[in-house]
């Protein structure tokens, strides 16, 4: 016979009636259930946008379940690998070695070397104080022909600071090299989808002979690197703003944040920002 060993759950703090729920946080931010389903897109979908690259996740089984299923759902299992972290690895204090040797084993077993590896470290690396610089330095020494992109799957950090998604949308552009800008090129950062050909921004830029570079239209690794040639960096997606601004500062480029809007006045204001930045004639509502 089963016997209750704890106290009966008091619904007072465990339940909130709809009429009493307050926006934006109806529940106290304490111990929470982590649902295995978070919506349509996650960091695996986003990382798969990088051409000629693979993703490697170093984490425990429970954390792996969602990302590996995403790769399978995308029919992209050939671009996805993982290194399973077990309890003994944490207790023995050798998580750096497990990460390095695990990634090395994955790459040695591949028939080819990808142009880049999006290497995702996780919460455990934070908990045990792993030396991430040592990990990446050693991997870059072993595989000088591969670009290792520093990515994170650390949802413990979502209560403050940048989310894993924001950090990923910055990291994907870290390989962009310093170069002289092309006066007739504009680069668009941080989006999940390429701008539609009928969009105001793209029609305006095409009208004046500008090349628009976007990650979603890049077919090769070199196409991605060529995004640094843009004289102006744009972002239209909130989660990509941090990454775009960071790369613009690093590469000394002018940048604009033009988020999607359904307000005519705001749209006109954004188009004016764009024309002013490029020195183009102001757009009229009739144009």
Where are these regions (language model features)?
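An N-terminal assembly and electron-transfer interface module characteristic of large anaerobic redox
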Residues: 1-287
């Amino acid at each position: 016979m089963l016997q209750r060993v704890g106290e009966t759950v008091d619904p007072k703090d465990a339940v909130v009636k709809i009429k009493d729920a307050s926006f934006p946080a109806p529940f106290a931010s304490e111990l929470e259930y982590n649902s295995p389903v978070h919506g349509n897109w996650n960091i695996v979908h986003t990382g798969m946008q990088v051409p000629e690259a693979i993703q490697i996740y170093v984490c425990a089984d429970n954390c792996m379940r969602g990302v590996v299923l995403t790769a399978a759902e995308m029919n992209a299992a050939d671009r996805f690998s993982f290194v399973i972290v077990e309890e003994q690895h944490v207790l023995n204090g050798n998580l750096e070695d497990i990460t390095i040797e695990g990634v090395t084993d994955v790459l040695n077993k591949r028939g080819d070397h990808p142009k880049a590896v999006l290497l995702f470290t996780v919460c455990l690396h934070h908990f045990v104080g792993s030396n991430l610089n040592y990990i990446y330095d050693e991997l870059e020494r072993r595989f000088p022909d591969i670009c290792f992109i520093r990515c994170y799957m650390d949802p413990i950090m979502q209560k403050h600071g940048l989310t894993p998604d924001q950090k990923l949308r910055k990291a994907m552009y870290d390989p962009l090299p310093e170069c002289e800008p092309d006066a007739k090129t504009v680069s668009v950062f941080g989006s999940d989808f390429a701008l539609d050909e009928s969009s105001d921004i793209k029609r305006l830029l095409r009208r004046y002979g500008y090349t628009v570079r976007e990650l979603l239209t890049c077919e090769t690794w070199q196409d991605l690197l060529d995004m640094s040639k843009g004289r102006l960096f744009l972002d239209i997606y909130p989660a990509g703003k941090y990454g775009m601004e960071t790369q613009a500062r690093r590469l000394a480029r002018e940048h604009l944040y033009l988020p999607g809007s359904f307000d005519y006045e705001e749209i006109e204001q954004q188009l004016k920002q764009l024309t002013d930045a490029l020195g183009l004639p102001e757009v009229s509502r009739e144009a």
